[in-house]
């Protein structure tokens, strides 16, 4: 079973995304914080990561940079999602593989998940 990790401090977003992903047959883990992001991801080894920008402890940009600098984790696709669409270029520079603006279209969300997981 493919696994997805979602980092977002908005509980409603976490619940909505989890429901959609589980309906697609994916295993989901969530975290409202980027505290120990490398350890969190290493212990789960997801096939895909969704990363919000505004998170406690460190920004999604900084967390993405850490993940992409880690030899063990750098090949896991990171989809950046944020209400601030102006941040997409910074996310790209940090190593994000894709960007979704919030609020996101559910069909676009599912399409992005399928693109990166093959489900």
Residue ranges and their predicted role:
Residues 52:
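Active-site residues of response regulator receiver
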Residues 11-29:
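Two-component/phosphorelay signaling modules centered on CheY-like receiver
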Residues 30-48:
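Acidic, metal-coordinating helix/loop segments flanking the phosphotransfer/catalytic sites
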Residues 14, 56, 74:
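The feature encodes the CheY-like receiver
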């Amino acid at each position: 079973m493919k696994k997805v990790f979602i980092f977002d401090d908005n509980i409603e977003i976490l619940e909505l995304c989890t429901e959609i992903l589980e309906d697609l047959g994916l295993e989901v883990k969530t975290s409202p914080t980027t505290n120990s992001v490398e350890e969190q991801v290493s212990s789960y080894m997801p096939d895909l990561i969704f990363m919000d920008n505004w998170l406690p402890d460190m920004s999604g940009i900084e967390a993405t940079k850490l993940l992409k600098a880690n030899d063990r984790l750098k090949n896991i696709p990171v989809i950046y999602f944020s209400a601030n669409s102006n941040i997409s270029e910074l996310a790209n520079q940090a190593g994000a593989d894709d960007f979704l603006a919030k609020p996101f279209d559910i069909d676009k969300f599912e399409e992005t998940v399928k693109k990166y997981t093959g489900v």
